Amino acid sequence: MIRVDNIVKYYGEHLALKGISYTINKGEIVGFLGPNGAGKSTMMRIITGYLPATSGFVYLDDYEIYDNPIELKRKIGYMPENISLYTEMTVIDYLKFAAKLKGISRKHIKGALENTIEITGLTKYKDRIIGHLSKGYKQRTGIAQAIIHDPEVLILDEPTSGLDPNQLIEVRSLIKSLGGTRTVILSTHILSEVEDTCERALIIDNGELIAEDTIEGLKTAMDREILGGNIELKVAGKVEDALIRVREVQGVIQAETDNFGSIIIECERGNDIRASIVKHLVQGDFEVLEIRAKERSLEEVFIYFTDKKKSEDFDKSKYIK
């Protein structure tokens, strides 16, 4: 388990992190989500022990990271955003070098190499020169050096930056496979990255943790508070006639059709009026084919929370679980 307690970081007079606290449980895959310059990379460097905090504490399994830094750092694997790979070396020679740096004994290096190369899908590429690899396989090599010593915690900073769509899918699948047995923390400004890969998201903006929950939990928190096109309805028959009927229901703010023949309904804050809509339509001899809460995108959630942070009455404690 990782526990971060009131971390503050100054660079000179610039306040980069503003008293951030959170807990990450063993086996979770958690995403740090935020715009460029939000403080994600700084937070990761502090967790790894690479960068000291100005104040606050980081605990790994209830031990403070600086109490026994060498022992605790052995439990962490780290791939920085711009990892320096030795491009003139082969993949296997580079991983041997990484294994020795991380203190793996001579008798265990062969097994560690075989296991890591298999997990990261590098078997066919182990004898290739790193400089000749595609961006996707360079990223796999970077992840391989981070897990060569079988760490309990894996920290990946922008692991899919610069990848093409096929490479994105492959690396995301690899990251998901690494969870469960180990804790995985990744940072990204790509919203789909968190939605596709992570179980939980921490939204960081301008050095502050402003929201923390599962993706669905964040969407639910947003839905509780705002007006929105949050009901999607499909009916048999004349959609325009059904639209008139829907607008008569108490609690409906606005209702319009979309390009796919569905009716999109905005309703009052915190008011689930789906049953009322169905009842009113049935009374008008309309057949309801489907009615459901319209899915929020993570992009909507991110924009909502970062915009809400600017308001004077913003209370981030309401959105941190």
Regions from the language model: what does each represent?
Residues 26, 124, 235-237, 267-269, ...:
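Non-catalytic surface loops within mature trypsin-like serine protease
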Residues 65, 236-238, 270, 294-295:
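Short beta->alpha junction loops/turns
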Residues 112, 130, 259-260, 294:
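Residue-level "edge-of-site" marker
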Residues 9, 254-257, 293:
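Hydrophobic/anchoring residues in structured secondary elements
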Residues 2-4, 9-211:
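ABC transporter nucleotide-binding domains
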Residues 172-268:
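ABC transporter nucleotide-binding domain
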Residues 269-321:
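C-terminal coupling/interaction segments
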